[in-house]
């Protein structure tokens, strides 16, 4: 009896994979209605914002840039035949280049924030870093001065407290006053760039022990979460929010998210069902800077299966996709794929230096960006289209 029940369970488990409309199973085009996110505002943000406002401790992106306390270093990655020659290449200061505590992942620019390409006349990059199991910081970089400053991401847990955020932050996208950050298993988080808070430069995160102030592990500024978009299907039909990018050629503008899946990776079901690799787009509201929703639900406008494993980031513009695939540490290189729907992708093997990650596209400069993750070999790279 138990044996029969077990066989029945395995059979149902296999059927569940086979009939899930979100999985590829020899398909390429998927139905966007099956990829939904629930919008949830952060309940304790207004009270904390009111407090920091009353203390004169709300600052701006411009002020963060003007207070930048670290310098990028002009440095080219090691190149060989077949590599894509970057138009620009920058390294972090020595401490950030060498640290194994923090690992860079995502990149976006002021050209994502606004179509004109600048934020208050500043050309800016933002790069995300994660500290495994602990926290996330983002670097605000002024492209004119080549100076930068780190800011910690936080989640308000009460009307008078906040905590660090322990996610991978594999991709980011800046849209108006919102910084979108992927949360691998849960969806997309949104952070309020109109509410950057100045805190005490002291140990600990959140309310200080004496209850008289706030701190963020010695960082001067924190960026609070304003809302999140939860993957409604959950673990019953998982989607990996590995990277994210903005497409201004779509109408309306869209956010595209995609999955990092290892070559040959399968689910742990009896049939060893291949883990799908999907790219999904969500429409944006240019006025509110939110995802477009109906009764609090964001539904994908486009979903597609793209059979390229180990992808760390991608951008799309005018129906052309530029895709960043990593292959490991040096001497290995990263690959660039250029793809259009219904066509075979063009592969540029070894195009990137090792550790290529998330991507961002700058319509004004006609260039795309990536950031490399491995310690002592970290770069921000710009390539002309």
What are the residue ranges of the model-derived segments?
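Structural signature of eukaryotic scaffold interfaces centered on beta-propeller domains
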Residues: 97-121, 165-175, 235-254, 307, ...
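Fungal secretory targeting signals
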Residues: 1-19
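Blade-level signature of beta-propeller repeat domains, shared across WD40, Kelch, NHL, RCC1
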Residues: 357-385
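Beta-propeller blade signature
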Residues: 135-146, 192-212, 269-289, 333-343, ...
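Beta-strand-rich domains and repeat architectures in extracellular enzymes and scaffolds
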Residues: 30-134
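Loop/turn-rich, solvent-exposed surfaces of beta-rich toroidal or solenoidal domains
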Residues: 112, 123, 254-357
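Surface-exposed loop and turn segments in beta-propeller and other repeat-based domains
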Residues: 64-100, 146-163, 203-238, 286-307
């Amino acid at each position: 009896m138990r044996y029969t029940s077990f066989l029945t369970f395995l059979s149902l488990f296999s059927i569940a994979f086979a009939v899930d409309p979100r999985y590829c199973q020899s398909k390429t085009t998927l139905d966007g209605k099956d990829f939904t996110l629930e919008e949830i505002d952060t309940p304790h943000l207004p009270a904390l914002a009111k407090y920091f406002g009353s203390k004169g401790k709300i600052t701006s992106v411009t002020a963060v840039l003007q207070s930048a306390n670290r310098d990028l270093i002009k440095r080219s990655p090691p190149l060989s035949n077949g590599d894509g020659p970057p138009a620009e290449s920058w390294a972090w200061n020595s401490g950030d280049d060498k640290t194994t505590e923090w690992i860079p992942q995502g990149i976006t620019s002021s050209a994502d924030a606004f179509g004109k390409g600048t934020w208050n006349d500043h050309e800016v990059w933002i790069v995300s870093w994660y500290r495994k199991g602990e926290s996330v910081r983002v670097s605000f970089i002024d492209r004119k001065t080549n100076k930068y400053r780190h800011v910690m991401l936080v989640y308000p847990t009460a009307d008078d407290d906040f905590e660090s955020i322990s996610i991978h932050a594999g991709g980011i996208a800046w849209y108006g006053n919102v910084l979108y950050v992927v949360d691998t298993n849960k969806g997309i988080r949104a952070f309020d760039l109109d509410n950057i808070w100045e805190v005490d430069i002291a140990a600990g995160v959140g309310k200080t022990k004496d209850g008289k102030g706030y701190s963020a592990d010695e960082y001067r500024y924190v960026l609070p979460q304003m809302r999140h978009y939860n993957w409604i299907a959950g673990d019953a039909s998982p989607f990996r929010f590995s990277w994210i990018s903005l497409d201004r050629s779509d109408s309306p503008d869209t956010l595209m998210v995609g999955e990092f899946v290892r070559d040959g990776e399968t689910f742990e079901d009896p049939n060893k069902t291949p883990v799908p690799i999907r790219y999904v787009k969500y429409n944006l509201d240019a006025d509110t800077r939110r995802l477009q929703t109906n009764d609090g639900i964001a539904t994908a406008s486009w979903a597609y299966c793209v059979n390229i494993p180990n992808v760390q980031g991608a951008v799309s513009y005018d129906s052309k996709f530029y895709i960043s695939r990593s292959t490991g540490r040096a001497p290995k290189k990263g690959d660039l794929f250029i793809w259009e729907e219904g066509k075979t992708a063009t592969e540029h093997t070894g195009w990137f230096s090792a550790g290529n990650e998330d991507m961002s596209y700058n319509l004004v400069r006609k260039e795309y960006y990536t950031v490399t993750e491995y310690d002592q070999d970290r770069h921000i790279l710009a390539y002309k289209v």
